[in-house]
Amino acid sequence: MKALQFGAGNIGRGFIGKTLSESGFSVIFSDVNQNIVDAINYNREYFVKIIGSNQNKTVNIKRVSAINSNDSNIKKIISSVDLITTAVGPTALEKIALIITQGIIFKIKNQFTKPLNIIACENKIKSSSFLKQVVLKNLPIKYHDYLNKYIGFIDCSIDTIIPAINNKDDLFLTVEEFKEWIVNINQFKGAVPKIVDMKFSNNLDAFIERKLFTLNTGHAIAAYLGLIKNYKTIQDAISDKKIRVIVRSAMEESGSVLIKRYNFNKNDHLDYIEKIFLRFENPFLSDKLERIGRNPLQKLRREDRLIKPFLGAFEYNLPYSNLAKGIAAAFYYHNKNDLESIELSSSIKKQGLESTIIKICDLPVNSKEVYSIILEYNLIKKIIR
């Protein structure tokens, strides 16, 4: 069995590539970083340190190779593999779709009918379904029947924390023991691959939003609040009592939306929040706030980790004040090394805060949602001082 993994970063190597290799796949990584591509091809293996609650261990990941995403030979690889996975970030999916489309055309022209399943592992709800629509848009209509018969696009939810830690070995990674990979079993074409610890669900939306509204929401809010106070790591941020209360309360507010929407058990969900907090506190998984907070425009989109639960609270007439504080902190964020942060700050300066919120978050003009964010923005430094 062969798999092509787009993205050889932390999640790509430390979670997906590792899991696929442990499941017996030969894994080909595709990335635009030629240094990483060369390192994988030179070593043909890499090491991952797993941080557990009781003990740590290091595992050796074998059967790996790599190719640059711009290499024309990638279409041949796409036509021959059994599985494609991605961990490139939601904004890069459209570029990946163009590459996949060329591979599918090559597969069709060579009359290959072996089913191919594609799992986009991104922080975007139904990212594989989105990827499918982009592929269909670029694929000639005469090939659509082939795609619908032989190409599966499987939506999923992934959950793990892999911090950015500087190592002498460019391929070495440190990961947490906790990992979750839940997929929609109904979307596979052909035989369902046997992948270690992969879970199947018929109600994937609930699990996708549970992870997005809890881990991602809490992570982002802790980062943006922490950066205002010049903290460096997630552990520093949640050690601050005021920030800790806001983050925990925001996660409970987003949790109330999940409980209402999906009929989750309240006590079970509070336990889930507690587990997330314990993961944030793990000193061996120290994660830099600048990494967590990067790309604020993406994180402030209507369907992402901050605005979506916030709007859910309005939808069900539930508390939202701490979510609003977190969103306000995101608009406060400025990092001269982050292009999206620079664009965000420039928009606030030129167009004003209100217009920027309306545009980026796709919120109604003169709405309570917008004014609640503005209110918290004007108070944010006093709140966490």
Swiss-Prot record:
InterPro entries registered for this protein in UniProt: 6-PGluconate_DH-like_C_sf (IPR008927), 6PGD_dom2 (IPR013328), Mannitol_1_phos_5_DH (IPR023028), Mannitol_DH (IPR000669), Mannitol_DH_C (IPR013118), Mannitol_DH_N (IPR013131), NAD(P)-bd_dom_sf (IPR036291)
EC number: 1.1.1.17
Record field: catalytic activity: D-mannitol 1-phosphate + NAD(+) = beta-D-fructose 6-phosphate + NADH + H(+)
GO molecular function terms attached to this record: mannitol-1-phosphate 5-dehydrogenase activity
GO biological process: mannitol catabolic process
Signal peptide: none
Enzyme class: oxidoreductase
Annotated positions binding NAD(+): A3, L4, Q5, F6, G7, A8, G9, N10, I11, G12, R13, G14
Gene Ontology cellular component list: cytosol
Superkingdom, natural source: Bacteria
Keywords assigned: NAD, Oxidoreductase
Entry's family note: Belongs to the mannitol dehydrogenase family.
Name of the protein described by the UniProt record: Mannitol-1-phosphate 5-dehydrogenase
Protein's organism: Buchnera aphidicola subsp. Acyrthosiphon pisum (strain APS)
